[in-house]
Amino acid sequence: VTINPTFVMGPGINPFGTSESFDSFNGFLNGDYKIGLPDLKMACVDVRDVARAHVKAGFIPSASGRYIISGHNSAFMRIGEILKKLDPSLVIGEKILPKWFMWLIAPKINSTRKEIATSIGYPFNAVNLKSINDLNMEYLPLEKTISDWLCQLKES
């Protein structure tokens, strides 16, 4: 059995952990997105759902093959909206930054122009039906993932 999670989000064992998801999330909290957000669409999953999927895959005898573990097809803008609702004091832009602008600043934001050209503005949807059907996965709501993560980071 192979477990393939999408963009992993949510509270961690160590609130000071480092990962791409922690860096992205901290960008919302630190004001990195105050002028606007990239048109970045992605599939994402709560870290606790990833852990549950691993356990279920290990204990369900019929589990086999590859499982896409993904709770939601979402976007940076949606994450920003949820955070703003949870904490109105956060300074998060409410508009989508143009792709050409993202392309220009790519080197300054630890990205490449190729990454911007191939990821910004394109939908990315993951299909999780096999994990739901075979592993009986029930994914946590995106709002809970973000709320719990925000609470953990504020407490640390």
Task: Tell me what each language-model feature is.
Residues 1-41:
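NAD(P)-dependent short-chain dehydrogenase/reductase
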